[in-house]
């Protein structure tokens, strides 16, 4: 007769294993072991959310949290790979609702889940079993790790949401853009900041030409007072001005007056402008700029100069080396004694003094746009200087830490017809251009005497442009 041990049920066997686990069976642990257990669980909860519950708590909660953790890791790995090899695709996510919105909600959900897991873990730790003097430090560690994880995740969700809001608000057009002769050419206009004058009289006009392959960029500055302007072949404005832009402003027909002339009198010539995210004034200005430069302009970006000040505030201001004292406000040219005496210029509201200064958006805008005691060419130089300083200030760290404020300012800053599908391509090229450095070509008489504002040699201007583009292909 043989005797055998009775079979052990799976449930009994599982319970036996649980009882042998020091992380789960707290009744058999002393205060020292409980302290060690607490630190292990806090570390696991931070590094692998859900693992602490799977080992020492509710396996159901642990499994849900662990699956969410794997999804989060997969999301970060994919984002990291795209950032390295296909940054344009990564940036395109911001313009895709069915991708950006679920990602933002998932990050917010995981941030909330992190807080829930920390509260659940606090109950599991049984800190009352520790020596009284050893209870506070694990509690602080749990709160700190939870705060770091939850804050990071919620901030990440906010960043994705802000990015989508910015892209969907600014880049409303659909489709993509093809390069022209291997380059993307974007017309940049700086509009007056008054609500009743926005865009009606561009303060600054330039063309940013970017190589589609290398990102090498040239910023071509066009003086706002350039005259004898014609329109590119095929432009409806040629019917009105067959011999060039004249008969509107009494012999002083500057290029920046085209916007208002078209808006007020010839808007019917561009019936499809609004449907394509533009305006008749912008389209007429584009036709003129294409004639001046000889370049095909794929897109425009109209900058609201008042909102530009908000962008400067969002990045924490800029540091400017002021070469000449400039008045804030005022309508009279005057020479201040010692660079800053209001008594010499009674209508000025204040002075921007010579020397290195840290400027907020309001002061930087006045520095870039002040008209008095200066000329248009110096004004163009100051505008480019401010633009360069802003671009240099928006480094990856600033972009990440202040993305929400930058995106909010940017949404009010730009009106453009760049389609959402081209945002990734343009931003990717912008990073390359910033790395290479943006070359400048100012079509002004101070640099090229043949380009006088009232009678410029446009053939010569196009030679200069082609030469600059070949050097930066």
What are these language model-derived features?
Residues 33-68, 72-73, 111:
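Hydrophobic, aromatic-rich membrane-embedded alpha-helical segments
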Residues 71-126:
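Membrane-embedded alpha-helical segments of integral membrane proteins
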Residues 74, 109-119, 147-154, 424, ...:
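Alpha-helical transmembrane segments
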Residues 131-162:
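Internal/C-terminal transmembrane anchor helices
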Residues 155-473:
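Non-catalytic, solvent-exposed segments at the cell envelope interface
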């Amino acid at each position: 007769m043989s005797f055998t041990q009775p079979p052990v049920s799976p449930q009994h066997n599982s319970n036996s294993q649980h009882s042998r686990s020091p992380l789960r069976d707290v009744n058999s642990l002393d205060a020292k072991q409980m302290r060690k257990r607490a630190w292990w669980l806090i570390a696991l909860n931070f590094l692998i959310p859900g693992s602490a519950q799977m080992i020492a708590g509710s396996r159901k909660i642990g499994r849900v949290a662990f699956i969410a953790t794997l999804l989060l890791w997969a999301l970060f790995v994919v984002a990291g790979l795209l950032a390295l090899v296909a940054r344009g695709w990564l940036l395109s996510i911001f313009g895709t609702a069915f991708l950006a919105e679920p990602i933002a909600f998932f990050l917010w959900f995981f941030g909330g889940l992190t807080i829930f897991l920390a509260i659940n873990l606090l109950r599991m730790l049984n800190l009352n079993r520790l020596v009284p003097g050893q209870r506070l430090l694990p509690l602080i560690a749990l709160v700190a790790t939870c705060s770091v994880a939850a804050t990071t995740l919620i901030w990440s969700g906010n960043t994705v949401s802000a990015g989508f809001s910015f892209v969907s608000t600014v880049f409303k057009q659909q489709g993509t853009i093809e390069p022209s002769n291997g380059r993307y050419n974007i017309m940049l206009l700086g509009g007056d900041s008054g609500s009743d004058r926005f865009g009606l009289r561009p303060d600054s006009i330039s063309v940013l030409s970017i190589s589609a392959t290398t990102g090498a960029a040239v910023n071509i500055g066009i003086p706002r007072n350039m005259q004898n302007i014609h329109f590119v072949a095929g432009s409806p404005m040629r019917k009105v001005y067959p011999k060039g832009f004249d008969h509107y402003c009494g012999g002083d027909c500057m290029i920046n007056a085209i916007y208002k002339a078209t808006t007020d009198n010839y808007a019917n010539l561009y019936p499809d402008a609004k449907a394509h995210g533009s305006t008749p004034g912008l389209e007429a200005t584009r036709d003129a700029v294409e004639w001046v430069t000889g370049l095909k302009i794929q897109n425009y970006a109209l900058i609201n100069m008042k909102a530009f000040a908000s962008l400067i505030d969002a990045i924490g201001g800029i540091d400017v080396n002021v070469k000449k004292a400039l008045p804030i406000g005022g309508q009279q040219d005057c020479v201040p004694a010692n660079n800053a005496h209001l008594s010499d210029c009674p209508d000025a509201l204040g002075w921007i003094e010579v020397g290195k200064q840290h400027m907020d958006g309001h002061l930087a805008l006045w520095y870039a746009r002040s008209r008095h005691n200066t000329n248009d060419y110096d004004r163009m130089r100051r505008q480019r200087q401010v633009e360069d300083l802003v671009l240099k200030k928006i480094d990856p760290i600033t972009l990440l830490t202040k993305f929400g404020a930058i995106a909010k300012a940017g949404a009010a800053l730009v009106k453009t017809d760049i389609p959402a599908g081209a945002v990734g391509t343009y931003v990717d090229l912008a990073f390359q251009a910033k790395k290479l450095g943006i070359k400048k070509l100012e079509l002004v008489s101070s640099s090229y005497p043949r380009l006088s504002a009232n009678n410029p040699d446009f053939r010569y201007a196009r030679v200069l442009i082609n030469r600059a583009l070949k050097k930066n292909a």
